[in-house]
Amino acid sequence: MKCNNCGSTMTYDVASYGLVCDHCGAKKQLHKPEEGTLVGEMDFASAMRGAGTNWGVSRRLVTCKSCGASMLFDPEQMSELCPFCGSAIVLTPEEADCGIAPNAMIPFSITKEEVTKKFYRWNKFAFWSPEKFRKGKVLGNLTPIYIPYWTFDADAVITYSGEFGYTTEIGEDTKTTWHKRSGIIEKHLDDHTVCGSRKFANDKLLNSVTSFTARDLIPYTPDALAGMPAEMYTIGLDEAWKNAQNEQMGKWITRACYGDTTADCHNNLNYSVEFHNLAYRYVLVPVWLAGCKYGGKIYNVAASGHNGTGNCHRPLSVAKLVTVIAVIMACMILGMFIPYLNLVPALAVPLAIVAFVIYLAMFMKTLSEQRAEEAAKKEPEP
């Protein structure tokens, strides 16, 4: 969007939920939907016929040559850094075919500064990481990006048959009685979520910070994307629905059968499902991404742009791990020898502490010598 004062580009401001001019600082407040307003679903069949492709604003598609991620940017942007790998990317002048347009989103509401503070607060509790990582300024530049997600709603008719077990307790024993059961269940599938990014569909780090409910969503607002990159979905609507049925629907159907039969377990369960009134939402979910540089490696960081929930990969302190193992082994060895030394059990703890201190001193001396040798090897010869 162009500024009414100077004609420069306006970008989304996380702190104010509005637009700010990059040149003159003019601001425009965006309209917030009433709290509790739910975003409706879109018809699945209509989307498969090509309807619902208007994003309300032109976007340009670019694929990072380093990591392969596909992203959508504002047309005014000429170059950017990839939010996923940090590589420099140059945008082409052609507008993109963006496919199906989103109808819901969660706008960024947590600022970069807030995420940074939260990260260093989390990091202090990373006991198993090296002290320099826990207490040092290791967090790289945080980059915002919207990640694509699909949600599905449908009316399901489940026809099932199988053997269902009912467990009863008789004293200390349990007995399971099996009965053949069959039936038809009518059930509503509500807001079943599938990640639309092939890159992150199985990424535990990202998925741990992107959970949301229907009450978190607002109708898609093009202005909230101003200056913000969005990853292009690489798992399309049809594929996402097939994945939901093939990989995730079995547990949901099994729970429905248990609820209908009140059974405790099952055997040889067979079922078929018919779905009606299938609808979807295409949701843009905000995420802050960064990397922590430590020991020549980069450890990924992800945080929710909605509630600040965060997670990251961390290095493991070998010294701490070895020390803990050594203490455990020392206590075990002392426990074995105490009967032969005619020592009272009360001496076990002091002896374990002494053994630990001796071992720690030897370990630190060895580690110091090793580091000195490595430093000497790096020094250039005269």
Language-model-derived ranges and their functions:
Residues 56, 100-297, 318-319, 323, ...:
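Charged, low-complexity helical/coil segments in non-catalytic cytosolic or luminal regions
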Residues 15-20, 33-39, 75-81, 94-100:
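Short cysteine/histidine-rich zinc-coordinating motifs and their immediately flanking basic loops
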Residues 281-332, 356-359, 363:
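Extended hydrophobic
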Residues 3-6, 21-24, 64-67, 82-85:
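Short cysteine-rich clusters marking metal-coordination/redox-active sites
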Residues 341-352:
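Hydrophobic alpha-helical transmembrane segments
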Residues 9-15, 51-59, 70-77:
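Short, flexible, mixed-charge glycine/proline-rich loop motifs
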Residues 25-32, 86-94:
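Short Cys/His-rich micro-motifs in 6-15 aa windows
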Residues 7-9, 27, 69-70, 88:
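Cys/His-rich metal-chelating microdomains
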